[in-house]
Curated annotation (Swiss-Prot):
Keywords: ATP-binding, Coiled coil, Helicase, Hydrolase, Nucleotide-binding, Nucleus, Ribosome biogenesis, RNA-binding. This is ATP-dependent RNA helicase DDX47. Part of a translational control module, also containing ath/DHX33 and ais/DDX52, which coordinates germline stem cell differentiation with ribosome biogenesis during oogenesis. This module allows for coregulation of ribosomal proteins and non1/GTPBP4, a p53 repressor, preventing p53 stabilization, cell cycle arrest and loss of stem cell differentiation. With atos, adjusts transcription and translation of a subset of OXPHOS genes in macrophages to increase mitochondrial bioenergetics and allow tissue invasion. Transmembrane segments: none annotated. The gene is pths. Disruption phenotype: Conditional RNAi-mediated knock-down in germline cells results in hypotrophy of the nucleolus. Residues 494-507 have a biased composition (Basic residues). It comes from Drosophila melanogaster (Fruit fly).
Amino acid sequence: MSETSEDEQTQLQTSDEEEDLGSEEEQEDEDNNHKEGDSEAALSGEDDKGSEDDAAEEQKLTWKDLGLNEALCQACDELKWKAPSKIQREAIPVALQGKDVIGLAETGSGKTGAFALPILHALLENPQRYFALVLTPTRELAFQIGEQFEALGSGIGIKCCVVVGGMDMVAQGLQLAKKPHIIIATPGRLVDHLENMKGFNLKAIKYLVMDEADRILNMDFEVELDKILKVLPRERRTFLFSATMTKKVKKLQRASLKDPVKVEVSNKYQTVEQLQQSYLFIPVKYKDVYLVHILNELAGNSFMIFCSTCNNTVKTALMLRALGLAAIPLHGQMSQNKRLAALNKFKAKNRSILISTDVASRGLDIPHVDVVVNFDIPTHSKDYIHRVGRTARAGRSGKAITLVSQYDIELYQRIEHLLGKQLTLYKCEEDEVMALQERVAEAQRTAKLELKDLEDTRGGHKRGGDTHDDSENFTGARKRMKPMGGTGGGGRKSFGKKNWSKGKQKR
């Protein structure tokens, strides 16, 4: 056991110089991979006919054709998974042959099913506790994967345990003591249990999955991964799934996989065809005004708005709620219970606008997002792919709008270079936008007061790591200002010009 781990640890921690090349190396990676993608597409002759052939193949193939157990085929039917997706068609047969798999696919392509179904198939053939370990970068993704395992295994008595930070360790320890079949964990909390929970080990694990592997490594979990790899048995199957293949992921592959089969069903930086991408060039001082204009123009849709900082999500949510819009924030400084509550309200359509940091840009399955707005342009161009991947999922159409200020031009050009195409300009009338300025300015002032009240009230708690409630406690703004356009809880009605003019009247 220790011999295995030393090899893995050595491979994972070699070539420090490679790690320190920084953003220039990453940009070079993007350039090279982009060129490779173009040449591969040209050589393979990918065109509309290829898409039609893929669609025809998808209609022909069934879950049974992939070699899955009948009980799992029935579970897929009950979940209304009509046919395997491209990544599932490619990865599942390879996994069922007992081979290690590297899966590269666009977000929203069904990666979870691609590793969950082979694991459950193997578990049915060889039932045992502590059968599989799934590592994920975020708590929300861990819970989502747990839900999918339980849904697929509901008819066969599968027991899962989700082990993440922000939750009670004692309760998690009790769950682990019951020896579940599947453990879904974030690396940091799993290491806590390995080091502190008497009698808990991973010596029996048959399957290791690293989902969103590039994100795990980008979040500086290398040390935790080393510790986990040290205690895993040599004889295991390993699945590595990622949206992108970086140098760090390649090193992890060498450290943890044996003769893997690479399954890649899309170009590295491809976005789905159903996604309409556009940009809007704006003065930074009127950023909030343009955002509100977009929400007004596209009223009736569900939105995910991405901000660069936790504080920005709170300020933007307060401002929108002051206008009567059903906005709810999601960021890394919220407690786990509040993060889950925010997600669940948005998924249940009780709130139509989710304002998030990049904590929610990867892996989460929120099927009804109609529009993604990049309020703050991402610093790393690859994060753009993951943000806009929240919409246009599972064959549905969607929109992505990026706000570009005078300070964001270089970052925006990197995104276009990465995509290999220019985005279209989102058309809007400046006069209509600026008609909202006074009302938005009033909402900004109200939001600023709200934020100060919250910080004053919760100053002590904030230092403890549990910041603003970010959802239901933003009531002061609504007391001071009348909501606009009767958006109510769902935010579905447009607050047109008539309502704006009413809002300007003295109260």
